[in-house]
Amino acid sequence: MKLRLLTATAGIAVATAMLVSPAAMADEALVKAKGCTACHANEKKLVGPAYKEVAKKYKGDAGAAAKLAEKVVKGGQGVWGPIPMPPNKVTDDEAKKMVAYILAM
């Protein structure tokens, strides 16, 4: 009985981990296509902060999505260290999608 429960629980955990919405996959592809991964990664700091660090820092901040989308478009500096993030050639809609993807981590 315990073995069945353990097997079922493990199976559910694996299946849940494998479920990624098509929208999230598209937003991840957008982040890669726009070159963001040259400076950022999901789990570790490269030139800029890890996406998970960004999500953690802005968790619960109702204005974070708009603030970060503007930084993606216009660039920014001083929040994560001395190296500035340059402006990016993305539309406002693309920036919002990318930020939503990052904040969902």
What are these regions (language model features)?
Residues 1-11:
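Bacterial N-terminal signal peptides that target proteins for export
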Residues 25-42:
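Sequence/structural segment immediately N-terminal to covalent heme-attachment motifs in c-type
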Residues 29, 101-105:
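Short hydrophobic/aromatic patches at helix-to-coil boundaries
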Residues 38, 47-58, 70-101:
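Axial heme c-ligation environment in periplasmic c-type cytochrome domains
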Residues 44-46, 105:
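Solvent-exposed loop/turn segments at secondary-structure junctions
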